[in-house]
């Protein structure tokens, strides 16, 4: 079954991309901090205008930038703002060990198959099956967005940004 894309992606010049991402933040009901499955959607509206949205328990955060990185930087800034969220939301990032996700401010869109969640200041780790939590997708095939979009996907995959 194909995933329903948000309404805002209907009028873009290029196909939208959707991925699930791991988030870490406080449950509004219980107050417990935990790992969440979030969603990131981005689309090249034109070759120089990228619109991105991150969805999670906090709702939707959207930004537009000249590149995927610029839009993502703006959203991370909002999620990490301690005046808006206490504690700030974090997105899990892959570290130098390919099987470990650390709490960080960057996004890794292509997960490994098994991972530990490493919480700063604690020795205990929570082991999660990332493939069960996230669905890795093949790199989409584009006409020409160009190569920037393909390169961005590869950058996310290789460097865990």
Residue ranges and their predicted role:
Residues 2-48, 61-65, 69, 73-80, ...:
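Long, contiguous binding/interaction regions
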Residues 51-53:
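General beta-strand recognition
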